[in-house]
Amino acid sequence: ELQEIGYRVESDFEPGSRNTAFETASRKFEFIPEESKDAAKNVMVKAEGEEPAYPLVLIPYDSPRLASGFIGDPPFMIKTVPDTVLKENDLLVEVHPKTAQSLGISEGKPAVLKTPKGEARVRVHLFEGIMPGLVAMPTGLGHQAYDGYLAGKGINFNDLIGPVEDEVSGLDAAWGIRAKLSRV
């Protein structure tokens, strides 16, 4: 097909030498160039927010039953989401029982989840599989559009988080944000 539609070749083009293709010390491709390794060793990307005001860290998690992108879930998929994730229109966040106990919060009870970017009313699901000090929120909920099966169900994780820049690469490293969980 390429022969039929044609292509262009510049007659004076000369490919570079393999020995000069990569301007690194090893002259090979390097995921992290030697010059950057020291800078990357001890850099931990901090979650946005100050610890005294926001003692917990909110992290997202994906569920195979929820689409986490811009597209909405089909209505039959919403019906398969367990009550430990979405109960009626209320989103449940996962909290370790020790963390919940220290906050005076129990299973299924309403709470306010606050971050430097916003706040939301949630319910609490106690889960020993999450590390104490973390709050996990499913992605893929909180749509404001589509239809009656999707709109208004849960909370959009993106409303509670913002970009965090990795100092070494300059890329967004928004893996979580500091948070506070309070009883209602």
Where are these regions (language model features)?
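Long, low-complexity segments enriched in small/aliphatic residues
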Residues: E1-D83
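Long, contiguous, secondary-structure-rich segments that constitute the structural scaffold
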Residues: E1-R8, S68-V184
